[in-house]
């Protein structure tokens, strides 16, 4: 019997090419995301192919919150701003103001009225005056860079439309069971078989774009002698936001299999100032030392990911909250941020540019492990590093293990270092 999610998926997913052909033909496809993310399936159809009959089908089998994913440029041209200035949604779902068609509709909520607004959103000749807000339909703004920047259903939808040569407007809604609980993969696949709908994982779109798109550019390289030995340092610039990232390479890694890799998020307080609140500086030092000892490997240093993506100022505010009894998870949530908002597409592209395909990843973080796999890299082994508990970081580390699922295997408290 097939039991694991990976086995179930691989036995039932169709090719990306088949899904693209179905979209061109006006058919539905289903995109499922990672189990570590929303773990849901969205029913998707091209905006320009929508009909009242197909909208009715969407409404009957989903939450009823039907959305249209469009590029940010298109939404700007239609004068549709974000719904809120401070997006506190767990996955930063990029809603704009809700809309109805300005003319030719009744209440705006019927299948016919929603079809009308989708047709307008998909029509490149539509203008801002063709819409009114608030309404009953929810446009979503796809991130520049698509699934390589954010591996969500919004970006998957727009990327699929562009790959199919259609207008960059797709309709999507989340599949639910008859009791309105969310469909998970087994139920999604059963539904797809019943209605003859193609199912693909978001990872298939990511893998395709990883091979066809280039979102980082190497701008300089040099020899870098360090206290751990000689490395070659490469500076990469993201073509998405202009941030410059680093790759420290030990030995000849191009084309090699099972290369030792550490993808490290910038932490000024831990990496530079020696903060005892976190284990970031120790992880960085241990990883560089271990790579140097093995003689071959890569350390990717991702800038702009301070405090699991919330920025230095907010991270220090989180420290103050922790001093008043919050743990690292609740501190982020109290400030309106996700527990961990980092994405790893740029890091993956740097590794691919270094001609890596299979890696041994130095990490305790399941989100990083699965995130890098989702970006087209094959992880053949996870390499843990020793974790040292101190009085200052004990609660932080235990929270990462108990509430964030990190694979730390913490020793008991009497192994605490001073």
UniProtKB/Swiss-Prot annotation:
InterPro entries: DHBP_synth_RibB-like_a/b_dom, DHBP_synthase_RibB, GTP_cyclohydro_II, RibA, RibA-like_sf, Riboflavin_synth_RibBA. One of its GO terms (cellular component) is cytosol. D-ribulose 5-phosphate binds at residues 37-38, 42, 150-154, 174. The active site is at 340 (proton acceptor), 342 (nucleophile). Its cofactor is Mg(2+); Mn(2+); Zn(2+). Its EC number is 4.1.99.12, 3.5.4.25. Coiled coil: none annotated. The record marks 136, 174 as: Essential for DHBP synthase activity. Pathway: Cofactor biosynthesis; riboflavin biosynthesis; 2-hydroxy-3-oxobutyl phosphate from D-ribulose 5-phosphate: step 1/1; Cofactor biosynthesis; riboflavin biosynthesis; 5-amino-6-(D-ribitylamino)uracil from GTP: step 1/4. Residues 212-418 are annotated as: GTP cyclohydrolase II. Keywords: GTP-binding, Hydrolase, Lyase, Magnesium, Manganese, Metal-binding, Multifunctional enzyme, Nucleotide-binding, Riboflavin biosynthesis, Zinc. Residues 1-211 are annotated as: DHBP synthase. SUPFAM superfamilies: RibA-like, YrdC/RibB. GO terms for molecular function: 3,4-dihydroxy-2-butanone-4-phosphate synthase activity; GTP binding; GTP cyclohydrolase II activity; magnesium ion binding; manganese ion binding; zinc ion binding. Mg(2+) 1 binds at residue 38. GTP binds at residues 262-266, 283, 306-308, 328, 363, 368. It catalyses: D-ribulose 5-phosphate = (2S)-2-hydroxy-3-oxobutyl phosphate + formate + H(+); GTP + 4 H2O = 2,5-diamino-6-hydroxy-4-(5-phosphoribosylamino)-pyrimidine + formate + 2 phosphate + 3 H(+). Mg(2+) 2 binds at residues 38, 153. Pfam families: DHBP_synthase, GTP_cyclohydro2. In the N-terminal section; belongs to the DHBP synthase family. In the C-terminal section; belongs to the GTP cyclohydrolase II family. Catalyzes the conversion of D-ribulose 5-phosphate to formate and 3,4-dihydroxy-2-butanone 4-phosphate. NCBIfam families: PRK00393.1, PRK09311.1, ribA, ribB. HAMAP family: RibA, RibBA. This is Riboflavin biosynthesis protein RibBA. It comes from Chlamydia pneumoniae.
């Amino acid at each position: 019997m097939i039991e694991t999610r990976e086995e179930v998926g691989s036995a039932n997913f169709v090719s990306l090419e088949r899904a693209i052909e179905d979209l061109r033909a006006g058919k539905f496809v289903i995109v499922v995301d990672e189990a570590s993310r929303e773990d849901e399936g969205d029913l998707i159809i091209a905006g320009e192919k929508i009909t009242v009959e197909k909208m009715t089908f969407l409404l009957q089998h989903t939450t009823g919150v039907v959305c249209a994913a469009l590029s940010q440029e298109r939404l700007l041209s239609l004068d549709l701003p974000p719904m809120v200035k401070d997006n506190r949604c767990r996955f930063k779902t990029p809603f704009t103001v809700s809309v109805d068609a300005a003319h030719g509709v009744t209440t705006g909520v019927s299948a016919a009225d929603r079809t009308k607004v989708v047709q307008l959103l998909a029509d490149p000749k539509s203008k801002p005056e063709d819409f009114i807000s608030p309404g009953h339909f929810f446009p979503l703004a796809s991130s520049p860079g698509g699934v390589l920047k954010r591996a969500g259903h919004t970006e998957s939808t727009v990327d699929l439309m562009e790959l199919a040569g259609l207008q960059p407007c797709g309709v999507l809604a989340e599949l639910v069971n008859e009791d309105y609980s969310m469909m998970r993969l087994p139920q999604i696949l059963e539904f797809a078989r019943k209605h003859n709908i193609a199912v693909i994982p978001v990872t298939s779109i990511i893998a395709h774009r990883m091979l066809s798109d280039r979102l980082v550019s190497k701008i300089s390289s040099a020899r870098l002698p360090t206290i751990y030995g000689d490395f070659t340092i490469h500076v990469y610039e993201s073509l998405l936001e202009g941030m410059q990232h680093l790759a420290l390479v030990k030995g000849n890694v191009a084309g090699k299999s099972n290369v030792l890799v550490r993808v490290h998020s910038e932490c000024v307080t831990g990496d530079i100032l020696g903060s005892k609140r976190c284990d970031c500086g120790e992880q960085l030092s241990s990883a560089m030392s271990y790579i140097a000892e093995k003689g071959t490997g890569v350390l990717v240093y991702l800038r702009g990911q301070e405090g699991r993506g919330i920025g230095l100022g907010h991270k220090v505010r989180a420290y103050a909250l922790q001093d008043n009894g919050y743990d690292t998870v609740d501190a982020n949530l109290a400030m309106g941020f996700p527990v961990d908002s980092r994405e790893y597409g740029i890091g993956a592209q740097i590794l691919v540019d270094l001609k890596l395909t299979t890696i041994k990843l130095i990490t305790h973080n399941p989100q990083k492990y699965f995130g890098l796999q989702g970006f087209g890299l094959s992880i053949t082994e996870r390499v843990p590093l020793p974790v040292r508990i101190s009085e200052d970081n004990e609660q932080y580390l235990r929270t990462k293990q108990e509430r964030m699922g990190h694979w730390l295997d913490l020793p008991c408290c009497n192994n605490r270092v001073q």
